[in-house]
A protein has these predicted regions:
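FAD-binding subdomain of flavoenzyme oxidoreductases
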Residues: 79-89, 99-279
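C-terminal substrate-recognition/cap domain of FAD-linked oxidoreductases
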Residues: 3-11, 235, 241-323
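A common structural junction motif
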Residues: 44-47, 117-120, 278-287
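Acidic/histidine-enriched ion/cofactor-binding microenvironments in catalytic or ligand-binding pockets
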Residues: 41, 150-152, 162, 311-314
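Conserved hydrophobic/aromatic beta-strand scaffold that supports enzyme active sites
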Residues: 26, 71, 157, 258-260, ...
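N-terminal flexible segment immediately upstream of the FAD-binding catalytic core
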Residues: 1-40, 57-97, 125, 248-249, ...
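Glycine-rich beta-strand-to-loop/alpha-helix junction loops that act as flexible
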Residues: 52-56
Length: 323
């Protein structure tokens, strides 16, 4: 429990660099089990609770807006497993999974998957600094989302503390091991436990049409915070505090090539290529598009991009695809 100036100042802002107020206190629980009691104490003291992981977010979710706030930093919740083959509800065959607490850095899960010959699909550019809890709260994704979706699509289950300082466990049923919007109905089991996490108080089942999780022509809809009432995901910590999760990991195809495509001329003529390339590769039965990253001319100038073409000028756009 930290009241010192350094701890409070270092929790004033996140990657946004916005500053409004210093938090009253910073809490760094040692174990997942401590979370519910900390939330209960903050509620009793009428402190606004701000969950924080790596602080890499660009939406200001970890920025205190009032002095009467408590930042709960999950950085010490670092327990995780190697790849484990588990039987998931509704599936006949065991599935490769990785368990991780909320404070585990994203890249560590990716490394654990790679050691066993698998791939962790949630790969934001902040993977070296962001944490698992934030990935769930933001429904994070990266270039592999083209093939396997965002955090929501790759979760087998997750655990969180509710605003009532009680425990909630959410489990995906009949997981399709792919993008959630490809299924007609996505089902989840919600189990509500008391403050000790041992006594089951009630349970319910959510059956949500898969199409509601994506916006037609857009994909992930960042404006949809309610997300059909599914707890924790994409809520930015507003409906509870994520403490741990179990992820599905995937096998990469045997052969992978990274292709760099440079586009010159008018950018408006090049942009439709993104959709055309995606549609073309999705129509091929033996080929998968594992990722597609778009870099515009401003980004290319900023990173000092070295043109592969002999034209001698910077491209208007570069696409990097994993095929």
């Amino acid at each position: 429990i930290k009241f010192d100036g350094l701890s409070r100042v270092s929790h004033v802002t996140d990657a946004t660099d916005w500053r409004v107020e210093m938090p009253f206190v910073v809490l760094t629980p040692d174990t997942e089990a401590e979370m519910a009691a900390l939330v209960a104490g903050c509620v009793e003291l009428e402190l606004t609770i701000i969950p924080r992981g790596g602080g890499t977010g660009y939406t200001g979710g970890a920025v205190p807006l009032t002095w009467k706030s408590a930042v709960i930093n999950t950085e010490k919740l670092e327990a995780m497993s190697e790849v484990e083959m588990l039987s998931l509800p509704g599936l006949a065959q065991p599935v490769a999974t990785v368990f991780s607490e909320a404070g585990v850095v994203t890249q560590r899960v990716a490394d654990a998957a790679e050691r066993a010959g698998y791939v962790f699909a949630v790969d934001p550019t902040s993977a070296e600094a962001s944490c698992i809890g934030g990935n769930i709260a933001m429904n994070a994704g990266g270039k592999k989302a083209v093939l396997w979706g965002t955090a929501l699509d790759n979760l087998a289950s997750w655990k969180m503390v509710t605003p009532e300082a009680k425990w909630l466990e959410v489990t995906r049923l009949d997981h399709n091991l792919g993008k959630i919007h490809d299924v007609e109905v996505a089902s989840f089991e919600l189990k509500y436990f008391d403050a000790t996490g041992k006594k089951l108080e009630r349970s319910e089942r959510l059956d949500i049409p898969g199409s509601t999780f994506r916006k037609e022509g857009l994909g992930k809809d960042v404006t949809d915070k309610f997300l059909a009432g599914l707890p924790g995901i994409q809520k930015e910590g507003c409906d509870g505090l994520i403490t741990s999760a179990r992820w599905i990991v995937h096998r990469m195809p045997k052969h992978v090539r990274t292709v760099c495509m440079e586009f010159f001329g008018n950018a408006k003529d090049a942009v439709p290529s993104i959709v055309e390339i995606k549609d073309y590769l999705f129509s091929q039965s033996q080929v998968k598009l594992a990722g597609l990253e778009h870099l515009d001319d401003r980004y290319l100038k900023a990173v000092g991009y070295a043109t592969k073409s002999k034209r001698g000028t910077l491209p208007k756009m570069v696409l990097v695809g994993d095929i």
